[in-house]
């Protein structure tokens, strides 16, 4: 995805950083403002969190809204609740997959198939976009702790480099 949009930000490294974080967190642009769901976020707090000048935030928003291709995407982003850190509190299991090459198709399908054959329900599966994340991962939250016997089977899935269970 970033390959399509990165070219618009080549001359503006701070705007690139801001746009990447908007994508990463699912923050939407609407009416010259940035939203997390229906909650409008302040430019100054976003700037502080991203360690950029406050003026770079509205400049990035204006740039995105002026470009039809960018605006079509950034106006439709939605934040997502990631359950991996909550899972242990709920007595759920988490499978973290480190891929050999994140562009290899079928990693999620292969792991999900093993989980399903073990009669475990998947609560959530989140895959980091390999164009946005330096070290993309696949996280699968399952209804209970994963039996250790499944780890070698998951490691054997094509494209899996390593498996972390917690």
Name every feature range the model reports, one short phrase each.
Residues 43:
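Helix-turn-helix DNA-binding elements, focusing on the entry/boundary residues of the two helices
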Residues 46-47:
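Short alpha-helical "recognition helix" segments of helix-turn-helix
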Residues 60:
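Residues in the recognition helix of alpha-helical DNA-binding motifs
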Residues 2-33, 63-166:
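A conserved regulatory-domain signal marking ACT and ACT-like small-molecule sensing domains
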């Amino acid at each position: 995805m970033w390959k399509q949009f990165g070219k618009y930000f080549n001359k503006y490294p701070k705007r690139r950083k801001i746009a990447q974080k908007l994508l990463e967190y699912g923050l939407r642009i609407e009416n010259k403002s940035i939203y997390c769901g229906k909650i409008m976020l302040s430019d100054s707090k976003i700037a502080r969190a991203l360690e950029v000048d406050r003026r770079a935030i509205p400049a990035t928003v204006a740039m995105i809204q002026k470009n039809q291709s960018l605006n079509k995407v950034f106006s439709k982003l939605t934040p997502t609740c990631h359950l991996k850190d909550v899972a242990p509190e709920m007595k759920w299991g988490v499978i973290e997959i480190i891929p050999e090459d994140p562009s290899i198709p079928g990693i999620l399908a292969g792991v999900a198939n093993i989980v399903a054959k073990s009669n475990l329900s998947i609560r959530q599966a989140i895959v980091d976009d390999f164009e946005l994340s330096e070290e993309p991962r696949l996280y699968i939250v399952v209804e209970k702790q994963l039996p250790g016997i499944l780890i070698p089977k998951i490691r054997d899935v094509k494209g899996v480099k390593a498996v972390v269970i917690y």
